[in-house]
Regions:
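Bacterial N-terminal signal peptides that target proteins for export
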Residues: 1-8
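Beta->alpha turn/N-cap motifs
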Residues: 63, 70, 80-93, 120-121
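N-terminal, post-signal-peptide region of Sec/Tat-exported proteins
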Residues: 48-79
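Extracytoplasmic "Venus flytrap"
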Residues: 27-44, 64-69
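Contiguous mixed-secondary-structure segments that line small-molecule binding/active-site clefts
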Residues: 46-47, 88-132
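Bacterial N-terminal signal peptides
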Residues: 8-16
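Sec/Tat signal peptide C-region and signal peptidase I cleavage site
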Residues: 16-22
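Short, polar/charged alpha-helical segment
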Residues: 35-60, 120-124
Length: 132
């Protein structure tokens, strides 16, 4: 009986130790091709996460809709089919038209105007995203 408990405790310790040191891998769904700046930014983000986590978390990017097409990314992440994804906010306009505010033509004609629009719309945008 003592031997069984001893072996069981060693097994549990090994299991916990192995699990705590295991690197985690996430798949990141991207709608745009690898050379697009959205995908390039995501690739840089993935590299930074891996570096900053000491390799404990690796994000594998899947550009060009190879994991999920653009219109499917939000649902895939929301339902846990993908751990992470990138899609610009205005693509969620069917969920809430407010999320298209930064894509409306002539609403902001400079980076300064875009920042003002962002600051003015941020509280409502956060509420809209939280409601999804």
């Amino acid at each position: 009986m003592k031997i069984s408990k001893y072996i069981l405790s060693i097994f549990v310790a090994l299991l916990v130790f192995t699990h705590s040191n295991a690197a985690e891998k996430w798949d990141m769904a991207l709608a745009y091709g690898a050379s697009n700046f959205h995908s390039a930014n995501a690739t840089e983000f993935a590299k930074n996460v891996s570096d900053k986590s000491g390799g404990k978390l690796t994000i594998v990017t899947h550009p060009g809709g190879s994991l999920y097409k653009g219109g499917e990314i939000f649902r895939a992440v929301r339902t846990g089919q993908a751990q992470i994804g990138e899609r610009f906010m205005s693509a969620l306009g069917k969920e809430d038209p407010l999320l298209e505010i930064d894509s409306q033509p002539f609403l902001a004609s400079s980076y300064s105007d875009a920042m003002k629009l962002y600051k003015a719309s941020k509280p409502l945008t956060i509420s809209a995203l939280e409601a999804l």
